[in-house]
Amino acid sequence: MSLKQRYRETIQGKLLTELSFSNIHEVPKVTKITVNRGLGEAAQNAKFLEASITELSNITGQKVLVTRAKKAIAGFKIRQGMPIGVAVTLRGDRMYSFLERLINLALPRIRDFRGVSPKSFDGRGNYTLGVKEQIIFPEISYDKIDAIRGMDITIVTNARNDEEGRALLREMGMPFRSN
């Protein structure tokens, strides 16, 4: 059973009673997932940019948006219009499929993994986690990468507060660390 199907059939009903809502449309849901990688020092190197684009598109299965500098910053050796990062916004079926792979395949492959921090919510029910290595994803072959680079994954929900967002992600199977 896919995560989207499980959400519609079991998780929604469970959250309806757990959070004591009167209407099924009040139950929080994941609206989008943003995967972002800043290039940092590698911004001057075109090979790193190409590698980041192919890695993120392999992981997410979607075309990558190259983020560019809005203004020149001499201290960071950045000119206006230079590529400084890559980002992907996932919605719909691709979002649920990515979330399922993240929870069931990628996160358990992290070395010394004891769960993700339950404190990484932003106050509005959105969750952000940083991944230090891209090789935790099964789509990335260890032999084909030139450097180990991380990424930021933001799970945006329409929950009103952190408790609702935490309850939603816990029901979806997000392995939160117990502090």
Curated annotation (Swiss-Prot):
Gene3D superfamilies: 3.30.1440.10. PROSITE patterns: RIBOSOMAL_L5. The lineage of its organism: Eukaryota, Sar, Rhizaria, Cercozoa, Imbricatea. Belongs to the universal ribosomal protein uL5 family. It comes from Paulinella chromatophora. One of its GO terms (molecular function) is rRNA binding. Binds 5S rRNA, forms part of the central protuberance of the 50S subunit. One of its GO terms (biological process) is translation. Its main location: plastid. Part of the 50S ribosomal subunit; contacts the 5S rRNA. It is found in: Plastid, Organellar chromatophore. Pfam families: Ribosomal_L5, Ribosomal_L5_C. GO terms for cellular component: organellar chromatophore; plastid; ribonucleoprotein complex; ribosome. This is Large ribosomal subunit protein uL5c. Keywords: Organellar chromatophore, Plastid, Ribonucleoprotein, Ribosomal protein, RNA-binding, rRNA-binding.
